[in-house]
Amino acid sequence: MLQLTEKFKGTTTVGIVCKDGVVLAADRRASLGNIIYARNVTKIHKIDEHLAIAGAGDVGDILNLVRLLRAEAKLYYSQSGKRMSVKALATLLANIMNGAKYFPYLAWFLVGGYDEKPKLYSVDMVGGITEDKYATAGSGMEFAYSILDSEYKDNLTLEEGIKLAVKAINTAIKRDVFSGDGILVVTITKEGYKELSDSELEATLKQ
């Protein structure tokens, strides 16, 4: 199982809590062992207007869980009239992962969203869950953490968070052969979910 897990772990995802929202970022490369098999993969997935997850690992397992979480979030809203909270989504995902730990989903998730305030959780392959101000997952996580640990500070603006997330991903791309081929950045604020276009990202980085 460990060899299989190693084979599917390539990527780098980053999550950062800012004073006005959450930033999720990920590279776009998909690899299988030493082979690059896709260069424009979406690794950040919208669950609803105020919830999203970033997944590092096996694409099939990640998409299967994304479909399940979207359905659960819609069901929760239809039954209660309320949106599922970030903590509830992360806990649900952790319970699913833990329930499958003997035949695990080969994935590690960052769960970000906005309730009364921005929140970020990390959920590992066997259902361990941690609330963080910043987190990273995937084969480039050691390199990304070197940037986040030294440069993160409380009360970052959304623009500062975007710049830090991109810097962390770019550092991983330079050192990790399993990460690369561009960066996707998503923000989640009280106004909702937004995926930055290439031009919007470029403009933010120039500020």
Swiss-Prot record:
Regulation: The formation of the proteasomal ATPase PAN-20S proteasome complex, via the docking of the C-termini of PAN into the intersubunit pockets in the alpha-rings, triggers opening of the gate for substrate entry. Interconversion between the open-gate and close-gate conformations leads to a dynamic regulation of the 20S proteasome proteolysis activity.
Domain of life of the source: Archaea
Enzyme Commission number(s) of this protein: 3.4.25.1
Record's subcellular location: Cytoplasm
Active site, UniProt feature: T11
PROSITE patterns, per database record: PROTEASOME_BETA_1, PROTEASOME_BETA_2
GO BP term (any one): proteasomal protein catabolic process
Propeptide: 1-10
MF terms (GO), sorted A to Z: threonine-type endopeptidase activity
Cross-referenced CDD domains: proteasome_beta_archeal
EC class: hydrolase
The keyword Hydrolase belongs to this UniProt entry's keyword annotation: yes
The entry's keywords: Autocatalytic cleavage, Cytoplasm, Hydrolase, Protease, Proteasome, Threonine protease, Zymogen
GO cellular component: cytoplasm; proteasome core complex, beta-subunit complex
Catalytic activity: Cleavage of peptide bonds with very broad specificity
Alphabetized InterPro entries for the sequence: Ntn_hydrolases_N, Pept_T1A_Psome_bsu_arc, Pept_T1A_subB, Proteasome_bsu_CS, Proteasome_sua/b, Proteasome_suB-type
Entry-linked HAMAP family: Proteasome_B_A
Record-stated family: Belongs to the peptidase T1B family.
Function: Component of the proteasome core, a large protease complex with broad specificity involved in protein degradation.
Assembly notes: The 20S proteasome core is composed of 14 alpha and 14 beta subunits that assemble into four stacked heptameric rings, resulting in a barrel-shaped structure. The two inner rings, each composed of seven catalytic beta subunits, are sandwiched by two outer rings, each composed of seven alpha subunits. The catalytic chamber with the active sites is on the inside of the barrel. Has a gated structure, the ends of the cylinder being occluded by the N-termini of the alpha-subunits. Is capped at one or both ends by the proteasome regulatory ATPase, PAN.
Protein name: Proteasome subunit beta 2
